[in-house]
Amino acid sequence: MRHYMWNRLSALCLALCLLAAGLPLTAFAASPSPVYESTILFTHDTHDHFLPMPDEEGGEYGGYTRLATLLKQEREAHPDALTLDAGDFSMGSLFQTIYATHAPELQALGAMGYDVTTLGNHEFDYRAQGLADMLNAAVDSGSPLPAIVQANYKPPESDTASLEAWERYGIQDYVILERGGISYGIFGLMGEEADSNAPMSGMEFEPTVEAAQRTVAAIQAELEQSSNPSLIICLSHSGTDGKGKGEDYELAKAVDGIDLIISGHTHTVLEEPIQVGNTLIVSAGEYTSYLGSLTLSWSEDGQKTIQDYRLIPVDETVAADPGMEQLTNRFQPLVESEYLAQYGLKFDQVLATTQFAFTPISQFATEQREDTLGNLIADSYIYAVQQAEGDDYVPVDFAVVASGVIRGSFAAGEITTSDAFNVSSLGSGADG
């Protein structure tokens, strides 16, 4: 069994002790120089956020256009960095309306240089056929695309359309990559709760622990053929609560050999990596709010150390990347012509204004109480029924909105078509 020393915390404690004792920091710094260094850049739960979102202070955050700039900057500093994503890259903005026909999400990840991603539950919001169509559209685009890994969530033998699309794209349980003298085994998992949140996916679910044990063993057998130092990374769409509970904590406890879990699905922000045995767990929040960066080093005696861990804000201080802006501008007219035109709407058309900001999505549903945005959406359901039934309208007694389907909010000022769509932007359910 490989034993690694994740000693950032102990190093910090030692440094503080040396300072308290009046000893020079050079005594602490006299450790073996790193022989190898590995940087992993990561995201998850980006949910189609090509464009920035309004923040609580009236500014903006996130967006692929700014994320692309940060990725380029980080790769300039770390040329051998891997760029990984832990799923739910779709469903969250108007760009999802061309998901099955143009695959803008995978084209965007490819344009930003992502090496590998996995599938989250929202990749199945348009069901198995929607995903199959998206995979085929991505391949047909001829654009650079990330590898997709998925070890425990697959089409049944009867779903030939999905099987053919998955094979055509090249979805595998895992991939082996070599970068900067280091070998990486990277695999993907769908969590149990995430599976339950995709009831219409039509996929076959293998328990995560069983799938991980099987896949890690296969990766280890391949990595043993190389003399390179290695890392086994799990792109897990399972999640944690950030406080010691969650499926990814249990995964780390149950499966030996996973060095790093990039934990998606729960939209958790982990300010520091969580260590469970010899496994690190990291998370970078939702909607491209942050770009995660983890740097590890190996010393001559084989010790592995956390050199750096950052959650880099994707905020207004980051300039938009011209190439990603160009790609976004190419997709926006397709959204208008293929989806919005039937409603007589434009992407940035102003529909209304509000003098106050609604509850920020980061604070929404944190406690059980009435909410203005929820009331507005519930009222819109009743209005839609009135419009549909006309003279035959039967009064509705009440309307209910599940908090989980509310995905955005309104800042003070103008409300555009795009803003309105983002608020309730998930795909189809059992009712169509």
Where are these regions (language model features)?
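Short linear sequence elements within intrinsically disordered, low-complexity coil regions
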Residues: 8-9, 129, 426
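Extreme N-terminus of proteins, especially the signal/transit-peptide cleavage junction
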Residues: 3, 30-36, 346-347, 394
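Acidic, metal/ion-coordinating pockets
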Residues: 30-317, 376-380
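Solvent-exposed loop/linker segments at secondary-structure transitions
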Residues: 47-49, 91-95, 109, 228, ...
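A generic, residue-level signal for flexible/boundary positions that often mark functional hotspots
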Residues: 17, 44, 118, 367-370
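Bacterial N-terminal signal peptides that target proteins for export
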Residues: 2-13
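Bacterial N-terminal signal peptides
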Residues: 12-24
